C-alpha cells in the first residue's frame, strides 16, 4: 500500500457529540489529499471511540482509532508520531480547529521539499511568504529569526497550525515534552524551527474556526489552582536548551528572558486573578517557587509589559487597573 501524503493526528477525549463534526470537517479539507487519520483517545468515558470508528467505516476513510488511557496530551501526540505512515504529519486539536489550510500546505511542501511548514498571522505577511519561497533576493529567515517572531507575536506558535515532515521528526528525534501539561506545543515548535534546514511559510492566514471548534471545560480544581505555572517550568527547560546550544544568538536569549518568560508569568497571574485567587496567595506562591525573580525587565521588555510588572511588584492593589 502506498504511503499517504499526510497523517492527521487527532487527540480526543469525551467529545462523542462533536467527533463526527470534527472528522467531517477534516474529510472535506483533505478530499484531494492522500491522507490517514490517527484518532487517539485519552480515555474517554463516553462513546467517542465508537463514534469515530463508525465515521471512518461509513465514509471509507483510511485511519485508525487507538486508546492511550491515562496519558497526557504530549504522550498521545508522541504515540501518533510513532504510528504515522504519512510523508507529512499535522496535528489537529478539536478545541481549536483552523480554517482550511492543509491543501495549500501540502502543495507548498511538494514545491519546496520543506521539512517544517507554518502559516501567516496577518494579511500583510502573505506577500512576503510568497516572495521568500520564489525569490533569491528576499532575505531568507532562519529558525532563530522565526523564534524571535514567535516571542514578539509576529507568528503563531501553535503545533496545531503546522505541517512537518515525518522523516525530519524521526531523523532529529523530535518529540513532544511528556513532562509538561502546558507549553508542550510551543516547545515542539521551537525544536522544529531550530533543527530544520528547509522552512516554508505558507501564504495562508491561520484563523481558528470557532463554529467548528469544540468548546471544552478547562476548569481546574482548587488543589491544582497554581498548575498553570508548569508552563514557566517548561519555558525554563527551553531556556536552558537555548543557552546550551544557541548561546551565540544573544538577542534570542534576551528576548526569551526579558519578554517571553515575564509575559507568560503575567498572563498566568491575570488568569488566577480572574478566578478570584487572592493577590497575596499568588505572590506568596511565586516567592516560594522563585518565579518573582523571573520578572526581569530589560531593553527587550515591551513598555506595556514593564508597566504591568512594575505595578504588580510595587502596587499590587492597583494591578487590576493596569
Question: Where are the model-predicted features located?
Answer:
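Cell-envelope/extracellular polymer assembly enzymes that use nucleotide-activated donors
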Residues: 5-7, 36, 187
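A conserved acidic beta->alpha catalytic loop
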Residues: 41-50
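Glycine-rich, basic loop-to-helix element that forms the pyrophosphate-binding segment
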Residues: 68-84
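Donor-binding/catalytic cores of nucleotide-activated saccharide
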Residues: 73, 96-202, 207-226
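Short aromatic/hydrophobic "clamp" motif used to bind/position activated sugar donors
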Residues: 89
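Catalytic core of nucleotide-sugar-dependent glycosyltransferases
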Residues: 204-248, 267, 274-293
